[in-house]
Amino acid sequence: MRAGHFGWRAARNAVRREVQVPRLDFAETRHLNSLVQRPPMAKSSGIIVTVGITGASGAGYAQSVLRLLDGDPRVQRVFLVASEAGMRLLATELGVVPTDAKKLPSLLTGTAAKKIEYLPNKDIGASIASGSAIVDGMVIVPCSAGALGSIAAGTAGDLLTRAADVCLKERRPLVLCLRETPLNRIHLENMLRVHDAGATVMPAMPAFYYAPKKIDDLIEQFAFRVLAQLGLPQEKQYRWKGGKE
């Protein structure tokens, strides 16, 4: 009985030596991911977008993005989800404290916001948690380092990170507006991981070459660029035409 047992182990080990699964390093993985084409998002009308808000500073960016999406005739529907820290951020930076969370879209946009639907972050069974739901893309603005890490690790512990994970697995546009500085090695590696998985890492870095007059100009121009990444270019976005030496 004992001899037969060792004979079986020897045979198993022999098979393992014959069948070896190659391990891919980061460079090889990036190359393979680059070969997988992501379906284009842009279409004439009826675009559905998910907007996520986390606790990183930059609530004004989220507000501007939502206002633009709400007013864009090409956008049919917007799903809004905010983490607990994201809700605290909105209260701290914008003074938005809804007594009813469903009123959050209208409080942020200053309109009826009929095309924006608020989804609780704890509702892991919401439509956007499934790849079968029709969603054309997602932006997390601002995106905290914590949310970035969760997405990079694929843990998806709440609706916000699950919706982002769905975009990656379905090869849909995912824009992460990271708001963190300085960056440590873990942040940089997580940025590389989500990039290689198909996301667009778009740190919240405003531009100054168009001579903005006020902070709102900086915020709005950045929001224009965010929407461009989602296939929704805006006519008012400043376009650099070259400078003089």
Predicted segment positions?
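N-terminal amphipathic/hydrophobic targeting modules at extreme N-termini
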Residues: 3, 18-24, 29-34
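Alpha-helical protein-protein interaction elements
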Residues: 16-18, 27, 53, 232
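A cross-family phosphate/adenosyl-ligand binding-site feature
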Residues: 35, 41-174, 182-245
